[in-house]
A protein has these predicted regions:
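A short coil-to-beta-strand element that immediately follows conserved catalytic motifs
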Residues: 62-70
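Residue-level preference for beta-strand/loop junctions
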Residues: 5-7, 32, 80-82
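Short, charged/polar surface micro-motifs in flexible loops or helix N-caps
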Residues: 16-21, 29-30, 42, 61, ...
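Conserved N-terminal beta-strand and adjoining loop/helix that marks the start
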Residues: 1-22, 37-40
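Nudix hydrolase/Nudix homology domain
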Residues: 31-34, 103-152
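Conserved Nudix-box catalytic region and its N-terminal flanking loop in Nudix hydrolases
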Residues: 20-57
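Active-site-adjacent beta-strand/loop module that shapes the phosphate/pyrophosphate-binding cleft
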Residues: 74-97, 111-114, 130-134
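A structural signal for short, well-ordered beta-strand segments
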Residues: 13, 68, 86-88
Length: 152
């Protein structure tokens, strides 16, 4: 990671099918090993290109953006992370594990998890309520990532 950037832009996707949310398993912290798929935007990519690439790399799925849900941030000691979350639609592909060839933090599993079981995967009740509420306040800046229940 280049430390010269003031901001890192992280893009994540929410893909819900049959009342289940797509998650990836990777080491995040001592408390959580599951997260929404996504990653950093690379130089020369649009947000859409970056998210479509990350979803394909991490999950094997082809997606399209349905709508932007939230823009939030996390102030870290080294730099600020701008975190943009989108609602997605699957347009093709099958779930498959990535090669992890170039990943510093490998993905060990990819699966759909019932929304009712997200707490068991380290997600907050607040985040579950955001999903069940149909993403009220979608399309807005919500401040710290904790405000939508996505803090670690």
């Amino acid at each position: 990671m280049n430390q010269d950037y003031i901001f890192n832009i992280r893009i994540t996707g929410i893909l819900i099918e049959n009342n289940e949310l797509l998650l990836v398993q990777q080491k995040l912290s001592d408390k959580r090993n599951w997260s929404l798929p996504g990653g950093r935007l690379e130089r020369g990519e649009t947000i859409s290109q970056g998210l479509i690439r990350e979803m394909k790399e991490e999950t094997g799925l082809d997606v399209e953006i349905a709508r932007m849900l939230y823009l939030c941030d996390v102030a870290a000691s080294s730099n600020t992370i701008l975190h943009i979350t989108f609602l997605l639609r699957r347009i093709g592909g099958e779930i498959e594990l990535p090669s992890n060839e170039f990943d510093e933090n490998p993905i060990y599993d990819v699966k759909f998890v019932p929304i009712s079981e997200l707490v068991q995967y380290g997600f907050s009740e607040n985040f579950i309520q955001v999903i069940k509420g149909g993403f009220s306040n979608a399309g807005n800046y919500v401040g710290d990532k904790m405000n939508i229940g996505l803090g670690i």
